[in-house]
Amino acid sequence: MFIEIAGILGAADLRLADTVFAQKDAFESGARTAGRIARAVKNNEQAKPAGLAADLTMLVEKRLMKNDVFRAAARPRNFIRILLSRYTQGMAYGLHSDDAFMERQRVDLSFTLFLSPPESYEGGELIVEEPAGERLVKLEAGSLVLYPSATLHRVAEVTSGERRAAVGWIRSLVRSAEDRETLFDVALALRQAEAAGDRALTDRLLKIQGSLLRRWGED
């Protein structure tokens, strides 16, 4: 399942991001954390995991865990890693899929949380390969795209400006992408039943959701 979620970060959060990205000597080559194959096609910079950058990654995790849509779509067991990345003119990230394991944990989902307004840079689209063709993603600052980590994707070359983002990898409580999508559909139906005040249907859907989580979920 491929899903976009708007408004993960607010104005104050984005101001903190601006402060982090304005720091001198706070960034290093992004190739350091790439897998063996991806390292050859990765050309960006990422923040060193300390100080304000560490504060921002913790804030991103906190905001995501408070977002109902994100939790329903990802069913996160834990965040394996969150990095702050930037691309300036001439930088890009070639076609790749994310590692199956990071830090001895299975990687199920990846996300890109955009931190700079789309009009502030040219190029830099996240390009995802799908059976029907390529999907280009370039969202408003504070908005996120979530997708299975096995997806082939790349970042187009930035031709002007600076593309800023937080990228992260998640181990889900539910291994299968199809099962996560089914649970997401149940969560949407549950929200609709609650909004309609249909207590009987709400209880029935809660039972179904619980049964599916017991069947598909992992401790």
UniProtKB/Swiss-Prot annotation:
**Keyword Metal-binding attached:** yes
Q: Which is an annotated GO molecular function term of this record?
A: L-ascorbic acid binding
What InterPro entries does its record include? Oxoglu/Fe-dep_dioxygenase_dom (IPR005123), PKHD_hydroxylase (IPR023550), Pro_4_hyd_alph (IPR006620), Pro_4_hyd_alph_FE2OG_OXY (IPR044862)
- The enzyme's main class, written as a single word, is oxidoreductase
Give residues annotated as binding Fe cation: 96, 98, 153
Q: Which UniProt keywords apply?
A: Dioxygenase, Iron, Metal-binding, Oxidoreductase, Vitamin C
Q: List the disulfide bonds.
A: none
Q: How is the cofactor bound?
A: Binds 1 Fe(2+) ion per subunit.
- Which residue numbers delimit the Fe2OG dioxygenase domain? 78-172
Q: Which cofactor does it need?
A: Fe(2+); L-ascorbate
Enzyme Commission identifier(s): 1.14.11.-
- List ligand-binding residues for 2-oxoglutarate: 163
Q: Which HAMAP family match?
A: Hydroxyl_YbiX
Q: Which NCBIfam families match?
A: PRK05467.1-3 (NF003974)
Q: What is this protein called?
A: PKHD-type hydroxylase Plav_0037
What is the native source organism of this protein?
A: Parvibaculum lavamentivorans (strain DS-1 / DSM 13023 / NCIMB 13966)
